[in-house]
Amino acid sequence: MPEPAKSAPAPKKGSKKAVTKTQKKGDKKRXXXXXXXXXXXXXXXXXXXXXXXXXXXXXXXXMNSFVNDIFERIAGEASRLAHYNKRSTITSR
């Protein structure tokens, strides 16, 4: 039994790389990840702007809530405009 255990780690390393590549290609939840990243970007920007002041967790949660609310309002307005204009897609023109 020790022999298969020795040979198993080398293929696992290669297979892990292949698995992560396929997971990235098949990952369709990018929209949810983008919304969560907004809070991290806002916290990083606040830390860069005022290095002396530390951002509390409550402040980060409030900023995250604000950004998510704005995104939801923009998406709702875009949906309404698309419905009013009887268009299935929204363009920048």
Swiss-Prot record:
Disulfide pattern: none
Alphabetized UniProt keyword annotations: Acetylation, Chromosome, DNA-binding, Nucleosome core, Nucleus, Phosphoprotein, Ubl conjugation
Modified residues (N6-acetyllysine): K6, K13, K16, K21
InterPro entries xrefs: Histone-fold, Histone_H2A/H2B/H3, Histone_H2B
Record-listed Phosphoserine modification sites: S15
Biased composition (Basic residues): 13-28
Cellular compartments annotated: Nucleus; Chromosome
Function in brief: Core component of nucleosome. Nucleosomes wrap and compact DNA into chromatin, limiting DNA accessibility to the cellular machineries which require DNA as a template. Histones thereby play a central role in transcription regulation, DNA repair, DNA replication and chromosomal stability. DNA accessibility is regulated via a complex set of post-translational modifications of histones, also called histone code, and nucleosome remodeling.
Name by which UniProt lists this protein: Histone H2B
